[in-house]
A protein has these predicted regions:
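Conserved HGGG/HGGXW glycine-rich cap/lid loop of the alpha/beta-hydrolase fold
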Residues: 1-32, 198
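Residue in the alpha/beta-hydrolase core beta-strand immediately N-terminal to the catalytic nucleophile
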Residues: 26, 62, 85-88
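Conserved acidic catalytic loop of the alpha/beta-hydrolase fold
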Residues: 43-61
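Flexible "cap/lid" loop of the alpha/beta hydrolase fold
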Residues: 74, 78, 85-118
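Conserved loop-alpha-helix segment in the C-terminal half of the alpha/beta-hydrolase fold
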Residues: 179-215
Length: 217
């Protein structure tokens, strides 16, 4: 997820590491993958992930992406058709342009100043409280956000919005050509995620599961 690092999946890694071969990363500009020049596209980010998986000998991955990680997974499937064994979307949304209104697309391109204008303490609290329902989820996000300076955090948010707008505006196919499940927290309050997921499920004939007592993370 945007601004979150590999610690977002600590509990999932703990649950599945004895059964599955897992790889969790710090995306460019996140966690230990810093400093990083934030001028890349979503397609370039997918290419870097592909190179990492290839280097690790992982040739048919099941991609599990939360929020912006779900967008990245769709870009990966678009760029490397037939290579992905499965896709689990966690509180993400479709990259296909047809699902986003013109107003929403305009807002995506102009969201950065909203975050830059907020006091840093308020911004940190909003990042934690806005995405998590449980104390664990909120504290986990607080710890991940604490590693950034205000400028770093706002820079990540700005680049994330620009990157997504570029990928959506490219209006590529972004067809899900592998087994897929959509997961969405019943209490997700981030953007229009709760509205997009039923549309995505119906439009692409994908199964959607609502997760009880869960927010965005």
């Amino acid at each position: 997820g945007l601004t979150a690092d590999h610690r977002l999946f600590d509990k999932q890694v703990e649950a599945f590491e004895s059964t599955y071969n897992l790889l969790a990363w710090d995306a460019p500009g996140h966690g230990k993958s810093r400093p990083f020049v934030m001028d890349f596209t979503l397609a370039q980010k997918a290419a870097w992930l592909h190179a990492i998986l290839q280097a690790e000998g992982i040739t048919a991955p099941v991609l599990v992406g939360q929020s912006v990680g779900g967008y990245l997974s769709q870009a990966y499937i678009q760029a490397y058709p037939g290579e992905v064994r499965g896709f689990v979307s966690i509180d993400s949304a479709p990259l296909k342009r047809k699902y986003m209104s013109d107003k929403e697309f305009w807002m995506l391109n102009h969201m950065a100043p909203v975050y830059s204008a907020m006091p840093w303490k308020m911004l940190r609290n909003a990042a934690a409280q806005g995405i998590g329902i449980t104390e664990y989820a909120q504290q986990n996000m607080r710890e991940m956000v604490a590693q950034y300076s205000r400028d770093e955090f706002c820079g990540l948010m700005k680049h994330g919005f620009i990157m997504l707008a570029g990928a959506i505006g490219a209006d590529l196919g972004y067809d899900i050509t592998c087994p897929c499940i959509l997961l969405c927290g019943e209490h997700d309050k981030t953007g229009a995620t709760k509205r997009y997921n039923p549309m995505w499920a119906a439009g692409e004939h994908l199964p959607l599961t609502w997760v009880k007592d869960a927010g965005h993370n």
